[in-house]
A protein has these predicted regions:
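Domain-terminus/edge residues, biased toward the C-terminal soluble/receptor-binding domains
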Residues: 177-181, 189-308
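Active-site-adjacent loops and short helices of periplasmic peptidoglycan-processing enzymes
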Residues: 24-29, 33-197, 201-210, 267
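N-terminal export leaders
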Residues: 6-11
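Positively charged n-region of N-terminal signal peptides that target proteins for export
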Residues: 1-5
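C-terminal segment of classical bacterial N-terminal signal peptides
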Residues: 16-23
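Intrinsic disorder/low-complexity segments
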Residues: 12-15, 302
Length: 308
């Protein structure tokens, strides 16, 4: 009970200290279209309420939110308040709950048969009987989207998976994620849903944790399996791109969710949060992120986004 109470207290502190964009602020910028489920982006507005650029980026993701976190303004929105399956974006919340509970990162955790059930679409290089530290499991869940690592983190939580999922939903509620529901720690269930608005709050909260920042943006990591080392790579190719300054990121995919990508990045000196849900095609989410970056850079260089 003491640890569960700590989870709630720490989650509340994230909400109060780490999320400068209120739900009211986001809704004000998106209600023109998202409440009706429209699939075209609303005209972006500055923090002064002025319209910016007519030629918005041609994005292929079904739900999009682009926030200028530095100036607390919505730059682009499409169906941002619609709850959708979020796949492995879930693992950001999994990491946040584990780290908020202050469980020891050096504690060894064995991968068991319970972690192998995975479900359809699940792929993992972690075999039953392997033992990794909790820190390694978080690292692999965030960087390589390891489903068995995420499941083991939830299973080893005080009270097991039911208590862990309860803590995930409690933290979501405290962060103001009103369209969010979690049923598993890996994101393999299509019942894990959230809106782009909600995920922007999760990204901002996660970015306050240095462990999440580091692990989610590492390019590669290796763990020992008996006498051999297993190499893992980041699922987000953008972390390898030197033109990007990514602070935190997470990819996701299941059939019901499409390709998903969330990130916080510095673009032209501004902290920008990008949420892309339900993209189809192997490279669509990456291409959309690049289009957004190019668009923000262009509007800044043309003075169409205010600097004050």
């Amino acid at each position: 009970m003491e640890r569960k109470r700590d989870v709630l207290i720490l989650a509340a502190s994230y909400m109060l200290c780490a999320v400068p964009l209120s739900h009211a602020t986001i809704s004000a910028g998106t209600s023109a279209n998202t409440s009706t489920g429209a699939t075209t982006g609303v005209a972006p507005v500055s923090s002064h309420g002025k319209r910016l650029l007519a030629n918005q980026p041609d994005l292929r993701s079904n739900s999009v939110l682009v926030l200028d976190q530095t100036h607390s303004s919505v730059l682009y929105s499409r169906r941002a308040d619609v709850a959708m399956p979020i796949a492995s974006i879930t693992k950001l919340m999994t990491a946040l709950v584990v780290l908020s509970a202050q469980q020891p990162l050096d504690e060894p955790i064995e991968i068991t048969r319970d972690d192998l059930h995975g479900g359809r679409g699940s792929h993992s290089r972690l075999a039953a009987g392997m033992t990794l530290t909790r820190g390694d499991l978080i690292h692999l869940a965030l960087m390589s989207s390891e489903n068995r690592a995420a499941h083991a983190l939830g299973r080893s939580f005080p009270g097991g998976l039911p208590a862990f999922v309860q803590a995930m939903n409690a933290q979501a509620m405290l962060l103001g994620m009103v369209h969010t529901r979690f049923v598993d720690p890996a994101g393999l269930s299509s019942e894990n849903v959230a809106s782009s608005e909600d995920l922007s709050k999760l990204v901002i909260a996660a970015s306050e944790n240095p462990t999440i920042r580091r692990y989610s943006t590492d390019k590669a990591y290796a763990v020992r399996a008996g006498r051999r080392m297993i190499d893992f790579r980041n699922t987000d190719s953008l972390v390898l791109n030197p033109t990007w300054n990514i602070i935190v990121q997470k990819t996701g995919y299941i059939a019901e969710a499409g390709k998903c990508l969330v990130m916080q990045a510095v673009i032209e000196g501004r902290t920008v949060v990008i949420v892309l849900l339900d993209s189809f095609g192997k490279y669509t989410r990456v291409a959309d992120a690049k289009r957004i970056k190019k668009w923000v850079e262009a509007t800044l260089s043309e003075g169409l986004i205010h600097n004050s």
